[in-house]
Amino acid sequence: MQQSSYTFDELLACGRGEMFGPGNAQLPAPPMLMFDRIVRIESDGGKYGKGYVEAEFDINPDLWFFACHFIGDPVMPGCLGLDAMWQLVGFFLGWSGGPGRGRALGVGEVKFTGQVTPDVKRVTYKIDLKRVIMRKLVMGIADGVVEADGKPIYEAKDLKVGLFTAEQMAS
């Protein structure tokens, strides 16, 4: 049975390439790792019954991006929340047994209706897989929501991530 949640230390191991095997999906290391734990991952859950991932990121005023984005007006860059959603789709593909290294391929639509400021305590990412392709092409297509303290603030439709073997990346 596959593991259904992951601690920060386990995510760091994934970032070192120790989870899915050499040449396969890895998460980025901090500070680009944009979540502290995966609280739920399921192969057949979510809105579309194709898979679900939920992760959390503890926010504190000392996080690196608040010091530079923006001086006197600290806010987490929206692109980091978008990247976190891509990270989670890639993790799902590796967790599902897909071979290769993850690469973001695009997103259909992104809406920002709120922000992450230093007073926010927790960001939650919710990813609903719409399509999972496990052939020569390994790709996940998903919708995602980012919440700040339980309030939806970003929405992404058709997040696309692919896994590519060394041979595919060389050609």
UniProtKB/Swiss-Prot annotation:
Q: Name one GO molecular function term.
A: trans-2-decenoyl-acyl-carrier-protein isomerase activity
Please state where this protein is localized.
Cytoplasm
> Among its keywords, does the record have Lipid metabolism?
yes
What's one GO-annotated cellular component?
A: cytoplasm
Q: How does it assemble?
A: Homodimer.
In which family does this protein belong, per the annotation? Answer: Belongs to the thioester dehydratase family. FabA subfamily.
Q: What is this protein called?
A: 3-hydroxydecanoyl-[acyl-carrier-protein] dehydratase
